[in-house]
Amino acid sequence: MEEHHSMTVAPKNMAILVGGGPAPGINSVISAATIRGIIDGVDVLGIKDGFKWIMRGDISHIKELNIDNVSRIHFRGGSYIGIARENPTKDKKYLENVVTSLLRLNVDKLITIGGDDTAFSAMKVENLAAGRIRVVHVPKTIDNDLDLPHGICTFGFQTARHVGVNIVKNLMVDAQTTSRWYFVVSMGRKAGHLALGIGKSAGSTLTIIPEEFPEETIKLKKLVDILVGAIIKRLSSERPDGVAILAEGLVERLDPKDLEFLLNIERDAHDNIRLAEVNFGEILKFHVQDELKKFGLKATIVAKNIGYELRCSDPIPFDMEYTRDLGYCAAQFLIDGGNGAMISIQEGRFVPMYFNDIIDPLTKRTKVRMVDTQSEYYQISRRYMLRLTKEDFDDPHELAKYAATAGISLDAFRERFYYIAESDVWQMPDLNPNKFPRKINPVVNQEISDEENTVKPVSEKLPHETGKGKKTK
């Protein structure tokens, strides 16, 4: 009988790393993925501080993950294995070091957790590994700006919104109590999802996001006039208080002529402006108060940034459950031989979104999801904001109130502020029921026959059974 000799091959490991900024739910992904891998006999390694060390060829910053040390971390914010914004795509040598380091650690399965920059890095690592390492990405950001299908949020967003709403709720009470305005600048990068989510949920006086401006660049003066107009409108109702939520992404869209204050602003490893370092709220406060003085008006304004206090909050149950699904599916996808995809849960089912399908053909990077200002979600939020609209300028009585508050004529008020309403993308939500014709459900149009104990469609009944037609003697 022929003998078969087999070589003993060391079992391959699965590695997990976290890039970008913190978001509630990271630990739940780590926990779920680790437990799923270990149950299948796979050893799991936590790569500390994202790509920071392995892109330099240093494999000493590793934490062995097991059921004992991850089974309860899902309750907590932060990252059990640290986090970093280090960018391995800046230099091919860094990418080569990442792949080599993982191979030295006997890793053939990699789970990355992060936002659009980390997703791009994961895609580059997968390409360079050429099948030696299978890679899957779990989308994470409080900004909610990854290109997932409509209605599906990135993990961490719901918790960040929840915490942000509680902060704004307290500011709204403080504003009313002390007769002042708060200008709250919310994190969110280029998109306005977080600012709008907080503002709409809390019922803030108004929320301004970059997506509402159709023009490529936004004039600082226009932002100032929107805020001044809202304050005047509020004052006309004898309310000297309010809370304005401002998306930090507005900064990147400002006219270059208004960007002198950004010349020395620090950028991160992915060349993004550190928007949280821009004192945007204070800049707007200064200009708004200066404009109000021209009308003989005065407002106490306090500028506040929110973002850092949201990122490491303990996740709410929604994000704990959601990230458990994401972590499980990420590990299972790799165990089953999957590769090169971003994890998503759509209509309760796992759907891999392959890297090649989520790349923007123009930027060659992962696509960024912006707020759809044509959606009823946005249009309804605008309906509850207090800011100057075209309707205001069509109502002579309201217009007279605003002009009187500003101490100028109706014509002067119109000339000064109408342009901000004229160029506005907002429109009344169209919920006319005629847009939604009723569908006939055949089951509803049925009755049960007592004689036969069977369902008989109305259309099949005889005239005397329906009460229609003449009875014959």
How would you label these PLM feature ranges?
Residues 4-58:
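N-terminal phosphate-binding or glycine-rich loops at protein starts, especially the Walker A/P-loop
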Residues 13-16, 73-85, 140-152, 177-179, ...:
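Gly-rich Lys/Arg/Thr-decorated short loops/hinges at beta-loop-alpha junctions or inter-strand turns
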Residues 19-21, 42, 47-52, 85-86, ...:
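Short, ordered loop/turn segments at secondary-structure junctions
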Residues 23-33, 54-55, 92-96, 113-123, ...:
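Short glycine/serine/threonine-rich phosphate/pyrophosphate-binding segments
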